[in-house]
């Protein structure tokens, strides 16, 4: 409880002071208000803690200080747990060493590299800089970083759920082990384990491990590239082979293209990928020999066609729908809903353009509003929107990792080679080129793609020229 209290005066002056105040009140009963308020100018405020009986706790009557509060204690039925510092990252055999001994361990490289690497991290936390550690131990800053990062990669292999074999882990105990594991730092735990096994099987050097890691990291981003489907994402050899396969496409000289494909053939693992590389290698060798190579054999035109869509790809601008003269309200189907949901999506039965009313044949929960583009407005009764969570599933290279809407016409399902279509594969709706469907013998699709809509983005160039066929 808080209260206002007067400072404790000397006992001898208490009676005199009280009499003086009483005399002053009788002689000046009509003193101005501001003068009366000055009587409280000498008061001070202090905090007094009262106990259950109403008496102050702590000091005596002359003590106006806050009483000492003892530290909290746990109730009898609870266990009090004081703060404990985090465990030391140092191995047990280094915990009892003083600073000089720790520096000696690093200076003389006493033990395996992943055993003394925690000493570098501990010194950094104690205020040592890489240059001061180098001056004291002779380990350069680059090597310090390599050893510390490689230790973290090695720890992730040890903690792998699949259990990285201990006999394989010893392969990296050599002096060059940190350089190999350092290159795997950008991969996730599963990819690191696969890449480490591949590096051991092929006895790769740091440069080869770097190429392998980059190919595994880059492979998912290349979805939609020509030949990508033939390679396996979870196979390190296929990822590396696809990287070299792609480099062969970028080579200007035919001999360089053949050399890259031969290198790809050395590391490819799965049969579909091997067949794709061999077919491309045969074409490249005939081209290098001066033979005329038709576009259908493997074709430069196929690569160019794969790089751009055959339908308009539009990136919306902020406020474009609100400013449009006419808009269309279309039902939306998720890619995971399958072909049955696409077929049963509502169709427009009546439109009142004057009042802006639309009548459909059934209820629906998801709708999209798009500008009234001419090709879509002409088939608005059969139009439907397919929502794709990842635009990279689209069959062209310029697709990006973003959500997209595919506007399709259900009234036109016959497959022709020049078209783009929506088909169902394993219960999911996907977009495929008519040329590929025709080669597979597919004569009818779920719908024909009219336009692909991309979300707005904060940049001036909303629609790039290479997005159009």
UniProtKB/Swiss-Prot annotation:
Coiled coil: 246-294
Sequence segments annotated as region (Disordered): 1-78
Chain positions covered by the region annotation N-terminal alpha-helix: 90-281
Cross-referenced InterPro entries: RAF1, Raf1_C, Raf1_HTH, Raf1_N
Region entry C-terminal beta sheet, spans: 311-456
Superkingdom field: Eukaryota
Keywords linked to the UniProt accession: Chaperone, Chloroplast, Coiled coil, Plastid, Transit peptide
Chief place where the protein resides: plastid
Residue interval of the organelle targeting sequence: 1-46
GO cellular component annotations of the record: chloroplast
Cellular localisation: Plastid, Chloroplast
Gene Ontology terms: biological process: ribulose bisphosphate carboxylase complex assembly
Pfam families to which the protein is assigned, alphabetical: Raf1_HTH, Raf1_N, RuBisCo_chap_C
Sequence ranges of Basic residues compositional bias: 20-41
Comment text on domains: Has 3 domains, the N-terminal alpha-helical domain, an extended flexible linker and the C-terminal beta-sheet domain. The N-terminal alpha-helical domain stabilizes RbcL dimers and RbcL dimer-dimer interactions, facilitating RbcL(8) formation. The C-terminal beta-sheet domain probably dimerizes Raf1. The 2 C-terminal beta-sheet domains are swapped and pack against each other to form the dimer interface.
Protein task: Required for assembly or stability of RuBisCO. Acts at a postchaperonin step to fold and/or assemble the large subunit (LS) into RuBisCO.
UniProt similarity note: Belongs to the RAF family.
Protein name: Rubisco accumulation factor 1, chloroplastic
Gene name of the encoded protein: RAF1
């Amino acid at each position: 409880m808080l209260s206002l209290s007067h400072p404790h005066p000397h006992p001898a002056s208490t009676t005199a002071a009280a009499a003086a105040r009483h005399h002053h009140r009788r002689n000046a009963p009509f003193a101005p208000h501001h003068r009366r308020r000055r009587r409280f100018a000498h008061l001070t405020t202090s905090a007094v803690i009262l106990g259950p009986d109403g008496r102050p706790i702590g000091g005596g009557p002359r003590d106006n200080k806050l009483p000492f509060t003892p530290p909290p204690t746990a109730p009898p039925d609870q266990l009090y747990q004081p703060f404990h510092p985090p465990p030391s990252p140092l191995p047990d055999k280094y915990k009892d060493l003083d600073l000089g001994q720790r520096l000696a361990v690093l200076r003389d490289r006493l033990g395996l590299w992943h055993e003394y690497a925690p000493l570098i991290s501990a010194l950094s936390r104690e205020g040592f800089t890489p240059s001061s550690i180098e001056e004291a131990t002779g380990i350069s800053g680059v090597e310090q970083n390599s050893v510390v990062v490689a230790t973290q990669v090695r720890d992730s292999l040890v903690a792998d759920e699949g259990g990285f074999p201990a006999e394989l882990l010893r392969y990296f105990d050599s002096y060059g082990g940190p350089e190999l594991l350092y290159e795997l730092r950008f991969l996730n735990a599963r990819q690191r384990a696969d890449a480490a096994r591949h590096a051991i099987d092929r006895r790769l050097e740091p440069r080869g491990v770097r190429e392998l890691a980059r190919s595994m990291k880059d492979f998912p981003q290349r979805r939609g590239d020509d030949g990508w489907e033939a390679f396996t994402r979870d196979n390190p050899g296929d990822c590396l082979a696809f990287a070299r396969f792609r480099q062969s496409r970028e080579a200007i000289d035919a001999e360089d293209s053949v050399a890259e494909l031969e290198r790809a053939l050395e590391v490819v693992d799965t049969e579909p990928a091997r067949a794709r590389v061999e077919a491309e290698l045969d074409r490249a060798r005939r081209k290098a020999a001066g033979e005329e190579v038709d576009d259908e054999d493997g074709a430069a035109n196929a690569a160019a066609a794969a790089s751009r869509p055959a339908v308009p790809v539009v990136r919306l601008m902020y406020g474009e729908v609100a400013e449009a003269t006419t808009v269309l309200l279309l039902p939306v189907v998720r890619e995971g809903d399958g072909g049955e949901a696409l077929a049963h999506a509502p169709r427009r039965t009546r439109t009142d353009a004057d009042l802006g009313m639309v009548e459909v044949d059934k209820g629906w929960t998801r709708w999209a509003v798009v500008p009234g583009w001419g090709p879509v407005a002409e088939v608005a009764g059969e139009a439907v929107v397919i929502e794709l969570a990842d635009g990279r599933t689209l069959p062209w290279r310029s697709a990006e990792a973003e959500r997209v809407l595919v506007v399709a016409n259900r009234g036109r399902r016959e497959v022709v080679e020049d078209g783009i279509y929506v088909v169902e594969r394993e219960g999911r709706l996907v977009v495929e080129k008519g040329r590929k469907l025709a080669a597979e013998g597919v004569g009818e699709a779920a719908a024909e793609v009219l336009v692909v809509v991309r979300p707005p983005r904060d940049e001036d160039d909303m629609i790039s020229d290479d997005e159009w066929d």
